[in-house]
Amino acid sequence: KATIGMREYLVGTEVSANYWDSFFNYYPVVFPLIIFCSYYFSNDFRQGTVKHYIEKGLSRWSYFLSKLVIGWSVSFFFFVSAFLIGLLCNKIFFGISGLTFTSISNIVSYIFCEALYHMAVSTLAISLVFLIRNSSVSMAVNALLIFFGYLVLHGLESILGLGYNITIFWAISNINKTRIDMAVQWLPTAIIIFFAYMIIFGGVIGTIFKKRDIT
């Protein structure tokens, strides 16, 4: 029993160490993204913009979807900027041309995967803003999800004996898992994750937003 317990402890420690190692690779992009979403979109509630447009006759679903589209556009910009900066730094500091070692299909698939993951993250962040409607609280909740969401879900997987069947759909950690040379295989998963986030988080919280008082 002691041997089994030590093995479980070491495996858990390895998962935690690997998580924090990869976390700091995607953190510089994802954290500014959720801060932007939390602050920018909560301004509409604070300044009365939401109430103004709804009273003008704009449907709540149209308003909510328009904000999601803005969030997706910003997410794509964040990812592309980070991607190009990374290529440029590799070229300048390490003399690496960047993408000569792989095929065009892998490069395109990688770009689509990463874009979909970032868009899924912004969907979650914006949905929470519309649920909470407070910039500070939204930032805190989104930051906690970035820091500890994967660990909580992986702990749940371990308790239920599900392997990685839950965390494979955690878009935030998948941002760093996807490799360019295997991006084609990851693309279906990225598509499923994006639409799942849009339906689950966007659909449920959008429905709540539709029924809530906005005064």
Regions found by a protein language model. Name each.
Residues S62-F64, F209:
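Alpha-helix N-cap/helix-start motif at helix boundaries, enriched for small hydrophobics
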